[in-house]
Amino acid sequence: MRHLEKPIRVAVHYCVVRSDVCDGWDVFIGVTLIGMFISYYLYALISICRKGEGLTTSNG
């Protein structure tokens, strides 16, 4: 997840510096998109781990 830190930091920095441009809706949409992306990322990791466990248990 380290590769996600820099874009998020840049987005937050841009939002803070350009506070006149960044209103409540921008923050809401940004947080929603980041939350959706992180939840999808975690779901993919969990499904991969479960497939790995299924393979090891089926081998015997």
Swiss-Prot record:
Keyword presence, Transmembrane: yes
Superkingdom assignment: Viruses
Transmembrane helix keyword on record: yes
Residues passing through the membrane, by range: 28-48
Subcellular location per the Swiss-Prot or TrEMBL entry: Host membrane
Cysteines paired by S-S bonds: none
Principal place of residence: host cell
Cellular component terms per the entry's GO annotation: host cell membrane; membrane
Bilayer disposition of the protein: Single-pass membrane protein
Keywords: Host membrane, Membrane, Transmembrane, Transmembrane helix
Protein name: Protein P7
Organism: Grapevine leafroll-associated virus 3 (isolate United States/NY1) (GLRaV-3)
